[in-house]
Amino acid sequence: MSHRKYEAPRHGHLGFLPRKRAASIRARVKAFPKDDRSKPVALTSFLGYKAGMTTIVRDLDRPGSKFHKREVVEAVTVVDTPPVVVVGVVGYVETPRGLRSLTTVWAEHLSDEVKRRFYKNWYKSKKKAFTKYSAKYAQDGAGIERELARIKKYASVVRVLVHTQIRKTPLAQKKAHLAEIQLNGGSISEKVDWAREHFEKTVAVDSVFEQNEMIDAIAVTKGHGFEGVTHRWGTKKLPRKTHRGLRKVACIGAWHPAHVMWSVARAGQRGYHSRTSINHKIYRVGKGDDEANGATSFDRTKKTITPMGGFVHYGEIKNDFIMVKGCIPGNRKRIVTLRKSLYTNTSRKALEEVSLKWIDTASKFGKGRFQTPAEKHAFMGTLKKDL
């Protein structure tokens, strides 16, 4: 029959409403892993910038599967993760209505790239942020120690304020991203001492994550602007001869109640939503100073993770990086929060040991043929432009 039956599942998921633009380009982290005080103090999240995607080849290690010990080709995302700088500590107390901020202690010196975060127009400002606060350290520091003692005495959750070193990335933006990251492990006193010792110091990504670990990626998705109801909700197109348009919803509700219900599919914003993508396996935690961070035990070619010509619309990666399986929310250059998994992963895929055989470093602009400039020169010879 050409018409619809009397019943059918609704189009689109109502669990992600309202579908509106995110309040900030850096997505909020609404939950952190459960604290285990028997472990050493460590960060639970890290900040990075999405650089792009590439392809890898590896041998599948899954006994019992038809593809065990066979080569598989998978897509991976590379996230540029320069070391973050610890600039503050926040203590939270538990109340009947949830966590409440007790107090915040900042470091004595803050770089200009994070001070820009507190100004709308840095160029025309007097740049006096935190000058009065820094004077507390110059006097005797008793007030600072008093606030740290309050956190040790009353707080039940300790989080540190960290900011990215955006100047180390290829991005033109000069304003660093600032975020709160929870500290897990150890007692409250040990957490506060850890934060105090790391004031104005950097923390590398390899001290937070390791290979084969399962993590979550939290970011704002790519924006697509105002979109029609058919593409936004996946509703069915109307018949060809329908009056006044086909890509619409024919009936948007009953006569009464005399308003449009919130659950009815309508046109509006699509994309630029805050989303959390869970259970991404880390395939590699690379070092920025390693000139062969794109090589493997099978492919001994000396090459970096950056493809020829750089990642499209991003550039060259000169810092530490993380390679995760699959795609993550956001477009290139987008700030991404990488968080330890909230759950204990026991699946075979999560526990599998990953050993990469080959990483594609051909140009991502067009159909790349060569993995390194040396390989291109050996095939093409001396070009006229190089004479």
From Swiss-Prot:
Methylation at His-243 by HPM1 is required for proper 60S subunit assembly and promotes translational elongation fidelity. The modification Phosphothreonine is found at residue 103. Keywords: Cytoplasm, Isopeptide bond, Methylation, Phosphoprotein, Ribonucleoprotein, Ribosomal protein, Ubl conjugation. The keyword Cytoplasm applies. The modification Pros-methylhistidine is found at residue 243. GO terms for cellular component: cytoplasm; cytosol; cytosolic large ribosomal subunit. There is a cross-link at residues 39, 136 (Glycyl lysine isopeptide (Lys-Gly) (interchain with G-Cter in ubiquitin)). SUPFAM superfamilies: Translation proteins (SSF50447). Present with 450 molecules/cell in log phase SD medium. Component of the ribosome, a large ribonucleoprotein complex responsible for the synthesis of proteins in the cell. The small ribosomal subunit (SSU) binds messenger RNAs (mRNAs) and translates the encoded message by selecting cognate aminoacyl-transfer RNA (tRNA) molecules. The large subunit (LSU) contains the ribosomal catalytic site termed the peptidyl transferase center (PTC), which catalyzes the formation of peptide bonds, thereby polymerizing the amino acids delivered by tRNAs into a polypeptide chain. Belongs to the universal ribosomal protein uL3 family. Component of the large ribosomal subunit (LSU). Mature yeast ribosomes consist of a small (40S) and a large (60S) subunit. The 40S small subunit contains 1 molecule of ribosomal RNA (18S rRNA) and 33 different proteins (encoded by 57 genes). The large 60S subunit contains 3 rRNA molecules (25S, 5.8S and 5S rRNA) and 46 different proteins (encoded by 81 genes). uL3 forms together with ES39L one of the contact sites for the signal recognition particle that targets ribosomes to the endoplasmic reticulum membrane. This is Large ribosomal subunit protein uL3. It comes from Saccharomyces cerevisiae (strain ATCC 204508 / S288c) (Baker's yeast).
